[in-house]
Design a protein with these regions (language model features):
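Solvent-exposed interaction patches of small proteins and small membrane subunits
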Residues: 1-131
């Protein structure tokens, strides 16, 4: 698979993951839905940063980590200089290594804005790549 095929695969996978996250967020919240939505966010964010990384590589930028992918995506004009992207990374790191009820509640309330920001960035990649 060449890098452009990899990008297409990641874009399709991101779309599927994002739809699953949106489904969880649309349901009435209880602790199981909240935890499911957080888990879906983690998976969606992984696909998000890997998509950023791949597109940055296509553009000639080196991006080997989530943080580097976000920073290079800003330089490439894919994302705006918005602290939400680094906040998402921090939240993903927290959720992957700790579990606290209060933290889970706080994170859950941010998921709709995180989902929207990721979708906007991916839309910019699509527009730039396919136009």
């Amino acid at each position: 698979m060449d890098i452009e095929q990899k990008l297409q695969y990641l874009l399709n996978s991101f779309d599927k993951a994002c739809r699953q996250l949106e489904k969880a967020l649309a349901l009435p919240k209880d602790e199981f839905i909240r935890d499911s939505a957080i888990q879906r966010f983690e998976f969606t964010f992984e696909l998000f940063w890997k998509t950023l990384k791949t597109y940055c590589n296509i553009l000639g930028f080196k991006a080997d980590s989530p943080r580097a992918s976000i920073k290079q995506s800003f330089k490439a004009g894919i994302i705006k200089d918005n602290p939400i992207y680094l906040a998402m990374l921090q939240v993903r790191n927290l959720t992957a290594h700790t579990y606290e009820e209060k933290l889970a509640e706080e994170i859950y309330t941010k998921l709709p804005s995180y989902s929207k920001a990721m979708q906007e960035a991916i839309a910019n990649i699509r527009k730039d790549f396919y136009d």
